[in-house]
Amino acid sequence: MTASSRAPQASGSSDSERSPFVRLNELLGPHQPGKPLITLAVGEPQHPVPDFVGPVLAKHTADFGRYPMNQGTEPFRKAASAWLSSRFKLPRPLDPASELLVLNGSREGLFLAAITAARYVSPRPGKPAILMPNPFYPVYGAGARAAACEPVYLPTTVENGFLPDLDAIDEATLARTVAFYLASPANPQGSVAKPDYFKRLKQLADRYGFVILSDECYSEIYTREAPGSALECAGPDFTRVVAFQSLSKRSNLPGLRVGFAAGDKKFIGMFLELRNIAAPQVPVPLQHVATVAYGDEAHVEENRRLYRIKFDLADQIIGNRYGYRRPDGGFCVWLNTSELGDDVSITLRLFKEAGVRVVPGSYLARLQPDGFNPGAGYIRLALVQDGETTAQALHRLVETLG
């Protein structure tokens, strides 16, 4: 049985409930880096903050003195909707008043969306389930558990192009599915779903009545073809499709904590009801910055140029080692180091000998029922440092691992 045909079933262990970065700190904490530390572990962009951020904040500091509306300011919603229409081939423009909602970054939105999805769908037979790729962004699993749903992990491997195999999901699982988390570009592998994939997933959502939660936060980091959106294949009413965006990666603003959800009108309305009670509002001055950010592409193009340089360096320095492939999107490199040892040992070795901090792939994934961990044997590198530092880290990695 190939990895891509393994049954997608709910599973987990005690460690699976914990942050991979807490586990990484515990692994590396007792040790000292062998060389001056370079961290490629956390996906925190280190490129410069756009020049307009300071002046816009200064202009709107008085707005810190009032409570924001949870829906978001009208200028922000209009700017985000206009950006979506210009960036993607949508069936029609989204209504900024009813089909788009500001978020404190995408993470809290992705978490609360699971709770909304459980209310959005009709009753399920048996235990309601939320499907997600494996490896995956940990908030997906946390959201599923908070919604009293069973997280179902769909292995993403080299055999299935690092995207969930939609044809491997059994009908009983689909019948009890509440939501399907999809990341495109994927974290950590950088794979991108094509239109046919989105269309097939939408067909399943329509047939079984679940909602697609499309995490598209890496969509603006690419070096070749621009990734598409699930909204492009959602139909004129965007029914059962909600896309999530963020300025953290696109605009080098992880500290701004501004993103949005857009799509299905009914879902967005229910989402707003929940967030009016359970979620903190986004400060108005930060929404002013985000409004300007979504109206400017020059800084995004410069951002892509800098990442392109670093992926060119990875092409040259890593070459054909460790199953390296230039990702279709995002800024992560997913290396297969299984022939050199297990991923946890490799991570510790790189830290102790090379002073390079990476993430073991097994920490980003969960065990399938048969004991298979799709992240085992891999390490993830986030190419977020400047070009010179990135080159130094990659040279150290190759020199250490051979």
Please provide the spans of the model-predicted regions.
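Conserved core segment of the aminotransferase class I/II
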Residues: 234-308, 312-317, 401
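Helix C-cap/helix->beta junction micro-motif
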Residues: 31, 147, 207-208, 354
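Conserved glycine-rich beta-strand-loop-beta hairpin in the small C-terminal domain of fold type I
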Residues: 287, 291, 306-315, 324-337, ...
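N-terminal small-domain helix-loop-helix segment of the aminotransferase-like
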Residues: 12-108, 293-294, 401-402
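Generic structural signal for small/hydrophobic residues in well-ordered secondary structure
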Residues: 24, 40, 57, 80, ...
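Conserved core of the PLP fold type I
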Residues: 65-203, 220-221, 225-236
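A short helix->loop->beta-strand "cap" motif at the edges of active sites that frequently abuts
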Residues: 128, 207-210, 238-239
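PLP-dependent enzyme catalytic core of the Aspartate aminotransferase-like
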Residues: 85, 90, 349-358, 364-402
